[in-house]
UniProtKB/Swiss-Prot annotation:
It comes from the Eukaryota. Disulfide bonds join C58-C85, C71-C91, C75-C93. Coiled coil: none annotated. One of its GO terms (cellular component) is extracellular region. InterPro entries: Defensin_invertebrate/fungal, Scorpion_toxin-like_sf. Residues 1-17 form the signal peptide. Residues 18-55 form a propeptide. Gene3D superfamilies: Knottin, scorpion toxin-like. Antibacterial peptide mostly active against Gram-positive bacteria. SUPFAM superfamilies: Scorpion toxin-like. The lineage of its organism: Eukaryota, Metazoa, Ecdysozoa, Arthropoda, Hexapoda. This is Defensin. Keywords: Antibiotic, Antimicrobial, Defensin, Disulfide bond, Immunity, Innate immunity, Secreted, Signal. It is found in: Secreted.
Length: 95
């Protein structure tokens, strides 16, 4: 058993030592002729504006009949004087 462990250690040491190269030797760099890569040409795309309408207070709470009251409470919490739900079920706050 000792012989097997010793042989395994020797094989491991040799396997680790084999890939070592001389650090002082000049490095050979083989570069392929480079073509201009088309994928690196990036185009600037215009930023699209994202418009998000708040529909929770008017759309989901309309089934319970509290849509206008919930919209008014929502607007009061935002510091406005009140609000109402329009025909598109979007909460519109007063100034």
């Amino acid at each position: 058993m000792k012989n097997y462990v010793f042989a395994l250690l020797v094989v491991t040491a040799v396997a680790i030592a084999l890939p070592n190269e001389d650090k002082n030797a000049p490095m050979r760099v083989h570069l392929l002729p480079q073509k201009e890569d088309e994928s690196l040409k990036l185009e600037v795309t215009p930023v699209k504006e994202h418009h998000r309408t708040r529909r929770f207070t008017c759309d989901l709470l309309s089934g319970a009949g509290v849509d206008h009251s919930a919209c008014a409470a929502h607007c009061i919490l935002r510091g406005k004087t009140g609000g109402r739900c329009n025909s598109d079920r979007v909460c519109v706050c007063r100034a």
